[in-house]
Amino acid sequence: KKNGYAVDSSGKAPECLLSNYCYNECTKVHYADKGYCCLLSCYCVGLSDDKKVLEISDARKKYCDFVTIN
């Protein structure tokens, strides 16, 4: 499993202000374990390896991984 910004068919990650929205978006739409709002987009934790995710910088990924774990 992997973490990242899950993208829809148009290649965009859902934008967010609230983590509740992302939890639902990530778990119900993308079947991840959890979801959080990180840097204004929904960051999903526990996505299946075949899910498409947004290409992001290592620094941004490390930041979101750090924030979602703590």
From Swiss-Prot:
Expressed by the venom gland. The keyword Ubl conjugation does not apply. It is found in: Secreted. GO terms for biological process: defense response. One of its GO terms (cellular component) is extracellular region. Excitatory insect beta-toxins induce a spastic paralysis. They bind voltage-independently at site-4 of sodium channels (Nav) and shift the voltage of activation toward more negative potentials thereby affecting sodium channel activation and promoting spontaneous and repetitive firing. In vivo, this toxin induces a fast excitatory contraction paralysis on fly larvae. It is active only on insects. Has the structural arrangement of an alpha-helix connected to antiparallel beta-sheets by disulfide bonds (CS-alpha/beta). This is Beta-insect excitatory toxin LqqIT1. It comes from Leiurus quinquestriatus quinquestriatus (Egyptian scorpion).
